[in-house]
Regions:
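Nucleotide/phosphate-binding catalytic cleft detector across ATP-hydrolyzing
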Residues: 1-134, 142-261, 268-314
Length: 314
């Protein structure tokens, strides 16, 4: 089995044909000319453009099967992660796109469950495990026990919102216009959610046009500024976590207090996040090993063991 690690669902189209996908497309994003179009088939964790999503999945399949030569269409089995708050219409769109792209056996798994599998939690155990997966489009919060999701919340506040927060902050406070790619680099380099880190990253030097004059402007951005501009968005995630804990049955709540809450997804790499959430909720938070790929690892495990994990999927 081959895993294609694709960090970003971005496509570059030329005359309605995909010419770049994933990381290659990301390098071209915001640098295209009028004849080339950037498309993000997914928005807030669900399909926003059905045809583009189908092309994207076909591209993924082609990358995985690039060295295989056959006269026959390969029998492709797929497991696709979906937000736990997906509607039936959104779920059907994912399944249809996957089948039209060449999937013969298509299974869907909720992302918090996939994340828990990827972290290494025993999702079938009769005890409560809580997962907070902060992805690109959504933050998935769920309590899992006996192979099922007991209570959950899916919040449309995650990495993309953080990136937009940074862009808006630079416009308002520094009068600098930056693109999403630059804002994401800032987020990765100095992204933080508390103003007093033990290990402080160096300020990020950013250059961009002045909004009023279009003259080049240089600014030094500190991690404290990023913590300030992300404060409200992180606060919405805190509210979601508390909301799910309020719904959690007492016995499972006791398990969570004992074992802590597990953080996954790229957003969990924000500096100081586990500390801030621990202080807010009064329950320990643990960042998973390699949290960026937790969902990918979980879907891979589910794909390898579809016979044993059918009760986890739909």
């Amino acid at each position: 089995m081959k895993i294609a690690a694709l960090n970003m669902c971005v496509m570059i189209l030329f005359r309605r044909k995909a010419i770049a996908l994933g990381q290659k497309a990301k390098l071209m994003q915001e640098r295209e000319n009028p004849g080339i179009k950037t498309v993000r088939p997914m928005k807030d964790g669900v399909i926003a453009d059905f045809n583009a999503a189908e092309m994207m999945i076909r591209g993924f399949i082609k990358q995985v099967n690039s060295k295989r030569r056959s006269l026959f269409t390969p029998n492709i089995k797929m497991v696709v992660g979906i937000p736990s708050g997906s509607t039936e219409v959104e779920i059907r769109a994912v399944r249809d796109s996957s089948e039209h792209a060449g999937g013969r056996e298509v299974y869907l798994i909720y992302e918090p469950m996939a994340s828990a599998l990827g972290i290494g939690l025993d999702v079938e155990a009769p005890k409560g495990n809580m997962v907070v997966d902060i992805g690109g489009g959504t933050t998935e919060i769920a309590v899992i026990s006996l192979g099922g999701i007991v209570c959950q919340d899916s919040i449309k506040v995650a990495g993309d919102v953080f990136t937009n927060d940074i862009q808006m902050y630079l416009r308002q406070q520094h009068n600098i216009k930056v693109g999403a790619i630059t804002a994401e680099r800032i987020k990765i380099a100095i992204g933080a959610v508390i103003p007093d880190l033990d290990e402080e990253p160096d300020p990020y030097q950013v250059t961009g046009p002045n909004l009023m004059t279009a003259h080049p402007v240089h600014a030094s951005i500190s991690y404290q500024e990023i913590a300030h501009c992300l404060d409200k968005s992180v606060g919405r995630i805190e509210t979601g976590i508390l909301h799910v804990l309020e719904q959690t049955p007492p016995e499972l709540y006791s398990d969570i207090v004992e074992n802590g809450i597990h953080l996954a997804g790229g957003g969990s790499l924000l500096r100081g996040l586990a500390k801030r959430l621990t202080e807010k909720v009064s329950i320990p938070f643990h960042v998973a090993d390699d949290p960026l790929r937790a969902v990918a690892r979980g879907t891979c495990l589910a794909l390898k063991n579809t016979e044993n994990y059918t009760f986890l999927m739909r």
